């Protein structure tokens, strides 16, 4: 059964999911879970370390298992990892159980936000070293091209590379409440 009060935030790494998610949850009176942080708490390892030691496929299995534990909750905002929708099982579960919201940013904005980050495993060279800004932007474009069809299947999309965080949260709150009103007849997402 689909829960209108189970909201999944998707978007590329650096799009604002972990920053906007808790603020949106507060605005709606919901709880918040960052799926990557939940995986880190369960395993005692950072996402980067899991990728380095166990590989991406192992991480994606952990991601699916962790996702399954939250899909029966309501009044919850879940920040997904940037690649979570690449798993058919994760994608199907998310679309069946809740409302998908895409936080969209362009590759230039994402490059500016991510070029100084060292904890993003998919933005490292094959040998694990740091990429140049040009290489980072190229990798972001490649990953966006692969992921955007699923990102674009979201019920609600908000641009996050323009404007301020507060106005983005207000826009999301309005759009979510409008969607809930339209689909359930309730006046708010509560």
Swiss-Prot record:
Subcellular location field: Cytoplasm
Disulfide bonds: none
Reactions performed catalytically: shikimate + ATP = 3-phosphoshikimate + ADP + H(+)
Binding positions (Mg(2+)): 18
InterPro entries in alphabetical order: P-loop_NTPase, Shikimate/glucono_kinase, Shikimate_kinase/TSH1, Shikimate_kinase_CS
Residues reported in the UniProt entry to bind substrate: 36, 60, 82, 147
GO CC term, one of those recorded: cytosol
Metal-binding is among the record's keywords: yes
UniProt KW Lyase keyword: no
Domain of life according to the entry: Bacteria
Cofactor note: Binds 1 Mg(2+) ion per subunit.
EC number: 2.7.1.71
Cofactor(s) this protein cannot do without: Mg(2+)
Pathway in which the depicted protein is active: Metabolic intermediate biosynthesis; chorismate biosynthesis; chorismate from D-erythrose 4-phosphate and phosphoenolpyruvate: step 5/7
Top-level class of the enzyme under EC nomenclature: transferase
GO molecular function, one term: ATP binding
Recorded coiled-coil stretches: none
Gene3D superfamilies: P-loop containing nucleotide triphosphate hydrolases (3.40.50.300)
Residues the entry annotates as binding ATP: 14-19, 120
Pfam family, one: SKI
Keywords: Amino-acid biosynthesis, Aromatic amino acid biosynthesis, ATP-binding, Cytoplasm, Kinase, Magnesium, Metal-binding, Nucleotide-binding, Transferase
Subcellular location, principal: cytoplasm
Subunit structure: Monomer.
Family: Belongs to the shikimate kinase family.
Protein function: Catalyzes the specific phosphorylation of the 3-hydroxyl group of shikimic acid using ATP as a cosubstrate.
Protein's UniProt name: Shikimate kinase
Source organism phylogeny: Bacteria, Pseudomonadati, Chlorobiota, Chlorobiia, Chlorobiales
